[in-house]
Amino acid sequence: MKPHFLDSKLTRSLYSDLAGSGEHLSSLSDETFLKNLLVVEAALAVAAAPEHAAMAKATIDSYQLDVEELSRRAAEGGNPLIPLVTDLKAINPAGIHIGATSQDIIDSALMLCMKEGVGEVVDKLKKLARDLAELTAEHKATPIMGRTLGQIATPTTFGALTGGWLVAVDNAARALEALEFPVSYGGASGNMTVVHPRGFEIQAKLAEELGLFDPQWVWHSDRTPITAIASALATAAGVVRKIAGDVVFYSQTEVGELREKSPGGSSAMPHKANPAAAIACDGYARRAPGLLATLFDALDCRLQRGTGSWHAEWATLRELAAVTHSAVSRAATSIDGITVNVDVMASRVNGPTGHAEDLAERALEIYGKGRS
């Protein structure tokens, strides 16, 4: 029996996918990435050779994608596009791969994955922000002791605290929404020689067909579009990790100021009520800095095409989007329906809360203006 380890439902970490509720499974899978290569080739035929577009589409539609087999063959040439184009041209070369190089198709396919995957992260962040806004409004005057450098400090309000979470989450969502996902089209050495002088015209049409951003430039060896996406994702992961860390602290037995709606148990200690969602969020988010570092290291894209640095991006960027989605999803689960033990909070307060309520109100104003 053929192994199913490359089935589209298992091409990513199962734990990571389930933690993100599964929504990001399809957009970031290896199968979708490879299918997007075909999507880009079909769009390129329309943009570069419209007279052959129908034949190219028929060729692509007739192609039977075998993810496992194509992945094996990709190792021989260093990327999956080489054997894919060979297969397509063997069926009918008309309209296939006009004026493009492997990097054009692969980078554009990756951007299709990321546009959808990042959009799913934004949706989760917005859900979290809505819940935080409700929490902030409800508890803007709820007194709690502030803590700095791990020690009891001065009184504040729980709403002021969650207001800080809210603004950071909203900022992270807006940064992701502002990202551009550029199409790539430059040809063999990035100078559009084969299609001169129509290169940028074709690029613009290709961007339109795919719903991607037209950079009006060739970015083969400029990997800043990748690091821009990666930075925004890693920032979002860090933002929710901070929230998760706070929830874990406030949920400690000796603190007891918060309790998740559905806390996790223990296989050996049945009395425990672990803040499982916050803990999982922390775990996923901790993977983001290492993935981000790999992508920044890939900025060293030598000459006109990276030797290994470019190849390192394909899985790493999708993995970063996946762990960020999982982290945000777990943070949203942690906050949704969380119990705020106001009496326990108040029992530790030793004075007035100052102007903390004003800060909670301001956080709500900032959030409201950003979404109006």
Regions from the language model: what does each represent?
Residues 1-186, 192, 200-205, 214, ...:
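A helix-coil-helix interface module used to build multimeric assemblies
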Residues 172, 187, 219-303:
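Glycine-rich anion/phosphate-binding loop at the beta-strand->alpha-helix junction
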Residues 25-29, 69-71, 264-280, 302-319, ...:
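Short beta-alpha connecting loops at secondary-structure transitions
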Residues 162, 196, 203-236:
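Conserved beta-strand/loop scaffold segments within soluble protein domains that form the structured core
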Residues 115-122, 126, 133, 163-166, ...:
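Short amphipathic alpha-helical segments with heptad-repeat character
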Residues 43-47, 87, 91, 131, ...:
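Generic, well-ordered alpha-helical scaffold segments in large soluble proteins
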Residues 287-359:
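Long, amphipathic alpha-helical stalk/connector segments used for oligomerization, subunit docking
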Residues 14-17, 142, 203-219, 256-257, ...:
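Acidic-glycine-rich active-site phosphate/pyrophosphate-binding loop
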